Each structure stands twice: as C-alpha cells, then as structure tokens.
C-alpha cells in the first residue's frame, strides 16, 4: 500500500471537441437565414479562434452559437478569453478569442495557499502549469477536491493522475 496518495489539478480541454464545436458553428452560420449572407469566417489556430464578420450584432450571434455548441460538447465556456472587437476594413469586424490552457502561476499560488491554509495534512506543490496535491489519506484528498469545486476560478479545473 502506498504511503502517500496524490492527484494533479490541471486546466485543459479536448482539442478535437473544440474543432467539432467550431465546425458545427460554421455549418449553422451557413444554414441560418439571418447569417447566411454575412460572409462570416471562423479561423481556428493553436493561439485562438478568430471570427471575421460584417457587424458587431452578427459577431454577438456567432459568439452565442459557438457557446451553445461548446456547451453541448462538454467544453467549459471558461476556456474562451474574448479579446477586443477590432475594425477589419470597411464595416467588417474581427475578434480574437484566445484559448485558456494550463493554470497561470498566480492562480496556482492562490490554489496552493488555499490548500495549505484549510488542510493541514495536505501538501500542494506547483509544477509548471499543474498543481500536485499529496496526502497520507485519500479522504483528505477528496475533501480538497470538494472544496476546490465550490470555488469559482477563471479557468476550468480538472483533477487527474490519481495515485
């Protein structure tokens, strides 16, 4: 039997599910009567998603469709970091939506501090964009998970690598 148990706190998403959500959004834009002639383009890169469209109103409609498709595919809406709306020549607008992946160092420190303050028998260590939590008791680890689920963080948290 292991002397200590641990798990990792990560913030990640399924890339293929995001690709599918963007693809479904594009199909709905082409099929919807109010968006059909807007010449809306979605461009997905590793850095983020760029939306090119005719107006800010259309941009808001596309964002709503994207959020619906992402939610149906079990993607957290917290992965989207909406940038400013920019003019793209003529009356067209564009917006870059950055994709959040990994736990930022400030947030990792905040999570680690919360764990240290509330759970004396649990150790938390920051390893890059992952927080490793370890303890001698599985019950303590489950209490940490329950406590973190009650918090509202700007990134979605997943608990992986149970040992």
UniProtKB/Swiss-Prot annotation:
The keyword Nucleotide-binding applies. Pfam families: DUF520. GO terms for molecular function: nucleotide binding. Coiled coil: none annotated. Gene3D superfamilies: 3.30.70.860, YajQ-like, domain 2 (3.30.70.990). The keyword Metal-binding does not apply. Keywords: Nucleotide-binding. One of its GO terms (cellular component) is cytosol. It comes from the Bacteria. HAMAP family: YajQ (MF_00632). Belongs to the YajQ family. Nucleotide-binding protein. This is Nucleotide-binding protein tll0793. It comes from Thermosynechococcus vestitus (strain NIES-2133 / IAM M-273 / BP-1).
């Amino acid at each position: 039997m292991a002397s200590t148990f641990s798990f990792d706190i990560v913030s990640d998403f399924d890339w293929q599910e995001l690709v599918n959500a963007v693809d479904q959004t594009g199909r709905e834009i082409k099929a919807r009567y109010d968006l059909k002639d807007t010449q809306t383009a979605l461009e997905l890169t590793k850095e983020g998603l760029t939306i090119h469209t005719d107006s800010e109103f259309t941009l808001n409609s596309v964002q709503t469709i994207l959020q619906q498709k992402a939610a149906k595919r079990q993607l957290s809406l917290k992965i989207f970091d909406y940038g400013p709306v920019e003019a793209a020549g003529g009356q067209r607008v564009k917006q870059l939506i950055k994709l959040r992946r990994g736990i930022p160092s400030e947030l990792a420190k905040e999570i680690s501090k919360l764990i240290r303050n509330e759970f004396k028998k649990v150790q938390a260590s920051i390893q890059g964009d992952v927080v490793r939590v370890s303890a001698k008791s599985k019950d303590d680890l489950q209490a940490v998970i329950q406590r973190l689920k009650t918090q509202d963080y700007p990134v979605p948290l997943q608990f992986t690598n149970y040992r």
